[in-house]
Amino acid sequence: RTANGVDKFIAISNFIARRIYKVYRRESVTIYPPVYVDDFSISHLKEDFYFTSSRMVPYKKIDLIVETFTKSFPNKKLIVIGDGPEFKKIKDLAGKNVTLLGYQKFDILKDHLSRAKAFIFAAEEDFGISPLEAQASGTPVIAFGKGGALETIRGLDDDDPTGLFFTEQTVDNLTKAISLFEKNVDKISAESCVVNAQRFSDSRFRNEFKKLVDDEYKEWKLNI
């Protein structure tokens, strides 16, 4: 009954729009959240390390990323920024090739995002801002192919790819995705990543949200 009283549903992704329809049988309009893409800077001199950052809680799957690099890629470097209740567990999983930096200030995060070879994103998110912050830094994303990531990252089948996906949250599947990325890294340009990230800018959000409110207000005025 409460849902029937809602004038307009706004979803943060098409993924959530489908969920709204499934639960409430109501259509919604998708307005992606604002990403402050201009706060990040591009670096064309990528260094030979992979990167991830997140609050260390179970659904973020940082343990999966660390375990994958420890077991499958002992000669590849992974740097992790973030803290949380799973930090000790993840530290115990980490091999010598994995560096855990814990919580860091934004400038340190920004620096690593711009220099990384790729950003690893293993969570299923309703939207997911971190992959777009990586792309705003000119950095490709290797992401779990479910949820909002499918709308914010352009896979290898796109004319201007910005990353690629893995289909299962397992060490084996992520291992295959990283190996595939290594073979196709030259197909992904920093410029394509930045252009894609700009589609989700904070100015775009303000314009879309204002237009929605203005349109709804005009319609309401016509009906009173």
Q: Model segments located where?
A:
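Donor nucleotide-sugar binding/catalytic pocket of nucleotide-sugar-dependent glycosyltransferases
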Residues: R1-F40
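Conserved donor-binding/catalytic core segment of Leloir-type glycosyltransferases
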Residues: I10, V35, S41-K60, I65-F73, ...
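Nucleotide-activated donor-binding/catalytic signature segment of Leloir-type glycosyltransferases, i.e.
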Residues: K88-K110
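Short alpha-helical donor nucleotide-sugar binding micro-motif in glycosyltransferases
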Residues: D111-A116, Q135, F209
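Acidic donor-binding loop of glycosyltransferase active sites
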Residues: S114-D126, T139
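Short hydrophobic beta-strand element within catalytic cores of glycosyltransferases
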Residues: P140-G145, L150-I153
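A charged, aromatic-enriched C-terminal amphipathic alpha-helix characteristic of glycosyltransferases
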Residues: Q169, K183-N223
